[in-house]
Amino acid sequence: MAHKKAGGSTRNGRDSESKRLGVKRFGGESVLAGNIIVRQRGTKFHAGVNVGIGRDHTLFALTDGKVKFQVKGPNNRKFISIEA
């Protein structure tokens, strides 16, 4: 006879790998062309001057320079630019 009741399987116990999103280069930091500035889902930050936007909304530097964060427009959107 069994002395323990049979353990049922659980439906939990899974978790997705973290995606390492967020700001990679902060305001005032020097960047080289091609450096990733922000990894994001959607456009939390928008591309400003000398900043490109990737297929997954990643923002990256198009030229060498310093990162500049600014809030612009009627909707207070956050823009990231590169000042040469």
Curated annotation (Swiss-Prot):
Q: Where is this region: Disordered?
A: 1-22
Q: Which Pfam families match?
A: Ribosomal_L27 (PF01016)
Keyword Chaperone annotated: no
A GO cellular component term found in this entry reads: cytosolic large ribosomal subunit
Q: What one GO molecular function would you report for this record?
A: structural constituent of ribosome
What's in the keyword line of the UniProt record?
Ribonucleoprotein, Ribosomal protein
Family recorded in the similarity comment = Belongs to the bacterial ribosomal protein bL27 family.
Can you name this protein? Large ribosomal subunit protein bL27
> Which species expresses this protein natively?
Shewanella frigidimarina (strain NCIMB 400)
Give the taxonomic lineage as stored in the record.
Bacteria, Pseudomonadati, Pseudomonadota, Gammaproteobacteria, Alteromonadales
